[in-house]
Amino acid sequence: MKVTVLSVGRLRPPWTDDVAHYEKLLGRHCRLEIVELRDGARLGARIPERAFVSVLDEGGTAYDSVGFSRFIEQRRMSGIDLCFVVGGAYGGVEVEADHRLSLGPMTLPHQLARVVLLEQLYRAHSILAGEPYHHG
């Protein structure tokens, strides 16, 4: 399964180390591509063809970690790649989406949202693989 994370804005320290950490861990479970774009105007053009598109949105569907792992497993079983879209500092992502994902009711800085998304992707894959990372 290929997972693409499209993000508006450039990642800056200290978040770069965290993203690199989860990028390395996720490499054992999926093919991960992280794409940073200067502005949201180009997002639509960078979405992979036939990918299931999930936009981060505070009004989207919220999952617990096990529920999110089930969401990932359903996508994996369908044979369709996943594309997550993370807006910039001012949000406002305007792309056609199959799904809207909430990381919780609080507003997060876009750089932190990217780290949280990658951590939850790793946690979901660890749950599916039966690895001891998740203690829930």
Model features per residue range: what roles?
Residues 1-26:
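N-terminal beta1-alpha1 ligand-phosphate binding loop
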Residues 5, 54, 87, 117:
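Conserved RecA-like P-loop NTPase ATPase core
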Residues 6, 35, 54, 99-101:
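Hydrophobic/aromatic beta-strand patches that form the interior of the parallel beta-sheet core
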Residues 11, 58-61, 88-91:
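Short glycine-rich anion-binding loops that position phosphate/pyrophosphate groups of nucleotides
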Residues 15-17, 64-66, 93-96, 112:
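Short glycine-/acidic-enriched loop or helix-start segments at secondary-structure transitions
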Residues 27-83:
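S-adenosyl-L-methionine/SAH cofactor-binding core of RNA-modifying enzymes
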